Amino acid sequence: MKKALAIVALVAAMFVAGNVQAQSTIYATYAPETFVAGSNSTNYQGFSVGFSQNIDLAKGIGVAAGAQFRMNMRNTTQTIWGITGKTNETQTIIDVPILINYKVAVNRDLAIIPFVGPMPSLALTGVTKGADPLFGENSYNWYGDNSNQSRFNLYAVFGADVKFTNFNLFGGYRLGLLDLDKTDNASLKTNGLFVGLGFTL
């Protein structure tokens, strides 16, 4: 709960900061994620929508703080002894990226803007649903009472934005820094690429 309140406080601070000369941008991204557990990895499809407010700190240097809603999804089908089972996994997340950026103006309309910074992340839901003719339907809550998986993560994010007038084409990488497995004998980390389109209001 304290972590959730901290993220809410960060988002509220961004709205306050919006009253100081700031540029607001809305965006959508394709953001697949890889879950790495020891030597095993599992790939999820991912998408997000969000907004950011960029505040100028000095000539060419700014900080963009925002919030985004992100979803990871994975569907699998497996047949054993003629019985086909299907599994659907879905995770929803709120991210709060806080990115330092440096604007390199190519001309009046075009700029290249590299960025880097932390991104606190809070998982809202995580569910695995399965169905097969033999056992019927079942589900597992990733964050239930008996779960060993943490909701909170902290990413290091870096990438670049190509801005043409009010349009943004950007991409980068996010690296999960925290071990999401609460036990001592296992580990779970996440990472992923992202590409997106944005519009500066």
Regions found by a protein language model. Give the residues of each.
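Cleavable N-terminal export/targeting peptides
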Residues: 1-23
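Short glycine/proline- and aromatic-enriched beta-strand/turn motifs that initiate or cap beta-hairpins
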Residues: 20-55
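Extracytoplasmic loops and strand-loop junctions of Gram-negative outer membrane beta-barrel proteins
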Residues: 32-36, 80-84, 138-144
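Short acidic, glycine/proline-rich loop/turn micro-motifs
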Residues: 36-39, 76-81, 181-183
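N-terminal, post-signal-peptide region of Sec/Tat-exported proteins
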Residues: 45-75
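Short hydrophobic/aromatic beta-strand or adjacent loop that forms the aromatic wall/cage
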Residues: 48, 95, 190-194
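Outer-membrane beta-barrel transmembrane domain signature
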Residues: 55-61, 86-182, 186-188, 200-201
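Surface-exposed loop and membrane-interface regions of Gram-negative outer-membrane beta-barrel proteins
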Residues: 68-91
